[in-house]
């Protein structure tokens, strides 16, 4: 087995990406566990395509051996909570739910409804409080060296430039399905009888919080349906947000 990588290990991201480029998504997961062991964790949003990565985990030797974090902002649609419960039961998942130390009511009292201002700075603050800080605190608490997400290069301009593994806020981020197309996601879900998010049937292709997600239109697709197109990233997958 390869030498484990932890927070103190020096690494060469170019060399690591070379190791990953010809591996399947399942092999990337196994590689990640070999490299990082208990210092590896996963994130899920229980969004449109979340079942794919969760099913891959449960189909591998990582089943019930790694932490899976779900960031509950307190503003998720009812359908997302119901979908999460469905997948947790169907896939026998052990989920760690992460929440901000600041309740939604307290945040609104202090800062107002940040998502209503149509101001990018306010949206960044919202993401920092409700998503980035809870994740960073959990990663630190459990000494996570590398966290795995289900981002894909087709989703946003920022993600089109991503590599399979690279540093995000002083930790490594691993992306097993980075190169998957929407078609591959659809057929994987179909072949493995994975249920669709309830809002998929209502025209949603990307789902975050209830107040900032909308169904697709003829002119607005994918993550452009989030926050009225002002922002396509929630802050978790970029380096701009710092604790």
Mark where each language-model region is:
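Nucleotide-activated chemistry modules centered on ATP-dependent adenylation/adenylyltransferase
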Residues: 2-243
